[in-house]
Amino acid sequence: MSQTPVATTPRNYPIFTVRWLALHTLGVPTVFFLGALAAMQFIRR
């Protein structure tokens, strides 16, 4: 997957790809949710 010829065809691989959108729409809320759960562990009285 990391062997894609980016140097020969730079215009076929923009920044916002389907894989980029899928990773960030799943990853960003997941990391935020895990961070919120971890932060809640320290709020206990």
UniProtKB/Swiss-Prot annotation:
It holds the Pfam family Cytochrom_B559. With its partner (PsbE) binds heme. PSII binds additional chlorophylls, carotenoids and specific lipids. Its cofactor is heme b. It is a single-pass membrane protein. It comes from the Bacteria. GO terms for biological process: photosynthetic electron transport chain. It is found in: Cellular thylakoid membrane. GO terms for molecular function: electron transfer activity; heme binding; iron ion binding. Keywords: Electron transport, Heme, Iron, Membrane, Metal-binding, Photosynthesis, Photosystem II, Thylakoid, Transmembrane, Transmembrane helix, Transport. Its main location: membrane. InterPro entries: PSII_cyt_b559_bsu, PSII_cyt_b559_CS, PSII_cyt_b559_N. Heterodimer of an alpha subunit and a beta subunit. PSII is composed of 1 copy each of membrane proteins PsbA, PsbB, PsbC, PsbD, PsbE, PsbF, PsbH, PsbI, PsbJ, PsbK, PsbL, PsbM, PsbT, PsbX, PsbY, PsbZ, Psb30/Ycf12, peripheral proteins PsbO, CyanoQ (PsbQ), PsbU, PsbV and a large number of cofactors. It forms dimeric complexes. Belongs to the PsbE/PsbF family. This b-type cytochrome is tightly associated with the reaction center of photosystem II (PSII). PSII is a light-driven water:plastoquinone oxidoreductase that uses light energy to abstract electrons from H(2)O, generating O(2) and a proton gradient subsequently used for ATP formation. It consists of a core antenna complex that captures photons, and an electron transfer chain that converts photonic excitation into a charge separation. This is Cytochrome b559 subunit beta. It comes from Parasynechococcus marenigrum (strain WH8102).
